[in-house]
Regions:
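Gly-Asp-aromatic-enriched flexible segments
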Residues: 1, 5-7, 11-187
Length: 187
């Protein structure tokens, strides 16, 4: 890590270089041994329901959740004010109406992510994000393509069953590509 001219320059152990403007940095967390990305876990169940009709195998493959990539196949992207895009290497891309259920076999304390609709939706899309822990509601929020990305940090102490539901909002499934960027659970 090197701080130079208002930017944080990062070189990974694999020799990848990144430059991040400090205005985009909220905090740095070095607790990787206590951190698990949801995209590295297999959900206990995944249920995708189309707005019209019944799910078929081709549609499930097309609209099912993606790990560490967007629905267009590239990195996960969110929009910042002024049209600037932020890219993320870890996370989940989820189309409405999708429910993911994770069975947590270890004791985790926090569930954190940066959330928004994919930058490529160009301001369209409208979903309801619901997160449950042991069937108890932890978060419910409408997310639109016109919103800035937001972070959440949820207490999941004692939770064995974590459910993420991305439900249809007012747009009836059009451009409903929610990105849960850096979605992680920590001990």
């Amino acid at each position: 890590l090197v701080l130079r001219s208002g930017d944080l320059h990062i070189t990974t152990s694999g020799a990848l270089n990144y430059k991040l403007p400090l205005v985009d940095l909220a905090k740095i967390d070095f607790s990787s041994e206590n951190l698990t990305y949801l995209s590295d876990l297999d959900p206990d169940s995944v249920t995708w329901t189309p707005f019209v009709g019944k799910p078929d195998p081709l549609a499930k493959a097309l609209f099912g959740p993606r790990r560490d990539r967007s629905f267009s196949g590239g990195l996960l992207q969110l929009s910042k004010p002024g049209g600037r895009e932020l890219e993320y290497r870890k996370g989940l891309a989820i189309q409405s109406r999708t429910q993911l259920v994770y069975r947590l076999t270890e004791q985790f304390q926090r569930f954190k992510a940066t959330v928004g609709l994919d930058h490529r939706t160009r301001g369209r899309g409208n979903v309801d994000l619901v997160i449950l822990g042991n069937r108890r509601e932890l978060l419910r929020k409408t997310v639109t393509g016109l919103m800035e990305p937001f972070d959440f940090d949820l207490d999941i102490s004692g939770i064995q069953r974590l459910t993420i539901l991305v439900d249809y909002g007012k747009g009836k499934g059009i451009q409903d590509h929610l990105n849960l960027c850096n979605a992680r659970i920590t001990k």
